[in-house]
């Protein structure tokens, strides 16, 4: 079978993505545009972008492969990945947007008033982002190898190049448009061939192929040793890990206000529910006509190989090309979101902002190059880890670190910096140990080995318990301005209250500060000090030094005057 159609589809997706990104470049002029799209993305567009970013290589290829190989137990994966947004909707979306932070480290310092917590959060963002980039590049290599027989590194390098070219010029503005486009492309790419495949397979007679996998084993849930623990651990990792993924959380900062964040999350639940029905169907079809892929160790490629197993000639080539385009879009959209979130943290916390917005943009672009290159190197090191399992471990790390910090930080005023650090270190240490054990193939037996395969059932409760216990033991370290911060997080934007200020010292020109004011006022956030140009540093939260330089700033909706640590809208 000729692969020219598939190669043409990959090229077309890459070129179209670059064209959409170039259009976004026309709208990107400030650091606010680069990092949070000036907090002006509408709910439907943002929901499409969130869904496009979230549906990664594991969703497009891995779910079908796992359903084919392991059976009905793997149905918990799409359920958990979708249900995680229900937690975001109820507990996190609106307060996180009202915080006015750029990134998770920004939120950590705002809530806990600790530079140490910020630094640890920054390291975790980088670690989680790089871990999640690995399966994206692995999937790209798998796709190109399946279609053309080319070495895996060719596909990995191609995705890295396109991602870099998309992110470097336009930042979050470009990425938002690209990811929204990719969601609908992925949906069409899976849905259209599925109609043809279901019609053809439904017309066949006889028994399904069994290959090396018995039908009875495939349909029996909770089979095997420690199956119940592994299932619970998988559910916990996917359910709680969603809110801890930095590239997911950063998208909520791009909404206009807390209400828009909630609306976007509701639309995301609908879009994800519609999408995740499709890879499960491919896994079931693969069990029917291509179960030999399991014995051959190619279960992850079942989506790409199904058309050629059912059809011949141009129809098979066309359907395979469409699926290849969707798979490539999955790698690109998730990778761009990850690169933006990790590069944003690197440019803020490690490279610095310099003397103005141009220096900040330059730092962001340099960080983008670093992130792409490092993730490529890590992909080579971890070549033997299955795509879907690499994603499961990433979710376990996120669920064991940022999820407890976010939930307790938003809803419990008793959380202290000591408790947050202790919890993230305990949960992160255990889950990262599982990652290293899996990556380097360190053989372990007994219950310890089971925990290393799926650590979330142990690491997540332990992280929560450690944060609560350490915070109760250090009540005297409770943040000084916690009451004001809680008002900031929970009071609706249309309620005009003194929400405090989040204005650390900055070295920027008056023009840049004026531009930030316009972006903040246009976002409709309603709170002062939440504009995207305000990055926390070592300056104490709410101190006079941190805010006196921000007095007398005019926005576009009216004048906003600041004096000391109080703010009033006139």
Where in the sequence are the language-model features?
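Long, low-complexity, intrinsically disordered cytosolic termini of multi-pass membrane proteins
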Residues: 491-570
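Membrane-embedded helix-loop-helix hairpins and adjacent transmembrane boundary segments
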Residues: 1-510, 567-570
């Amino acid at each position: 079978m000729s692969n020219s159609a598939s190669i043409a589809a990959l090229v077309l997706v890459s070129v179209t993505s670059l064209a959409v990104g170039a259009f976004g470049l026309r709208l990107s002029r400030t650091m606010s545009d680069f990092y949070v799209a000036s907090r002006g993305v509408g709910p439907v567009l943002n929901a499409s972008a969130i869904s496009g970013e979230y549906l990664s290589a594991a969703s497009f290829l891995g779910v079908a492969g796992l359903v084919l190989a392991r059976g009905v137990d793997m149905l918990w994966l799409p359920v958990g990945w979708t249900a995680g947004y229900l937690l975001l909707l109820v507990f996190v979306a609106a307060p996180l947007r009202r915080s006015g932070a750029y990134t998770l480290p920004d939120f950590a310092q705002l809530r806990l008033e600790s530079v140490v917590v910020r630094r640890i959060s920054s390291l975790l963002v980088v670690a989680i982002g790089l871990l999640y980039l690995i399966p994206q590049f692995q999937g790209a290599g798998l796709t190109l190898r399946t279609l053309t027989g080319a070495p895996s590194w060719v596909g990995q390098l191609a995705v890295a190049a396109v991602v870099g070219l998309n992110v470097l010029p336009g930042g979050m503005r470009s990425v938002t448009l690209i990811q929204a486009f990719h969601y609908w492309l992925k949906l069409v790419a899976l849905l259209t061939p599925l109609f043809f495949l279901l019609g053809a397979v439904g017309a066949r007679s006889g028994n399904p192929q069994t290959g090396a996998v018995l039908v009875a084993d495939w349909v029996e849930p909770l089979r095997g040793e420690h199956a119940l623990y592994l299932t619970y651990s998988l559910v916990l990792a996917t359910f709680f890990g969603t809110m801890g993924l930095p590239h997911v959380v950063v998208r909520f900062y791009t909404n206009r206000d807390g209400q828009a964040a909630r609306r976007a999350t509701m639309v995301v639940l609908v879009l994800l529910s519609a999408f995740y029905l499709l890879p499960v169907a491919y896994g079931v079809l693969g069990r029917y006509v291509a179960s030999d892929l399991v014995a051959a160790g190619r279960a992850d490629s079942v989506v790409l190989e199904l058309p050629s197993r059912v059809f011949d000639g141009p129809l098979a080539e066309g359907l395979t090309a469409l699926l290849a385009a969707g798979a490539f879009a999955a790698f690109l959209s998730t990778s761009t979101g990850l690169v933006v979130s990790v590069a944003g943290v690197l440019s803020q916390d490690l490279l610095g902002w310099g003397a103005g917005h141009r220096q900040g943009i330059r730092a962001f672009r340099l960080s983008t190059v670093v992130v792409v290159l490092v993730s490529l190197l890590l992909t080579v090191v971890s070549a033997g880890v299955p795509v879907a399992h690499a994603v499961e471990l990433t979710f376990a790390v996120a669920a064991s670190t940022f999820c407890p910090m976010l939930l307790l930080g938003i809803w419990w005023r008793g959380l202290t910096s000591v408790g947050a650090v202790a919890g993230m270190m305990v949960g992160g240490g255990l889950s990262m140990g599982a990652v290293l054990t899996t990556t380097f193939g360190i053989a372990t037996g007994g219950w310890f080995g089971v925990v290393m395969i799926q650590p979330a059932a142990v690491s997540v409760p332990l992280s929560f318990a450690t944060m609560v216990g350490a915070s109760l033991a250090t009540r005297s370290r409770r943040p000084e301005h916690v009451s004001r911060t809680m008002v900031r997080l929970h009071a609706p934007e249309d309620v005009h209250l003194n929400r405090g200020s989040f204005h650390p010292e900055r070295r920027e020109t008056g023009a840049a500060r004026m531009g930030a004011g316009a972006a903040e006022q246009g976002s409709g956030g309603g709170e002062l000090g939440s504009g995207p140009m305000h990055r926390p540093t070592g300056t104490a939260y709410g101190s006079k030094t941190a805010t006196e330089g921000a007095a007398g700033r005019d926005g576009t909706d009216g004048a906003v005057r600041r004096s000391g640590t109080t703010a009033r809208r006139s």
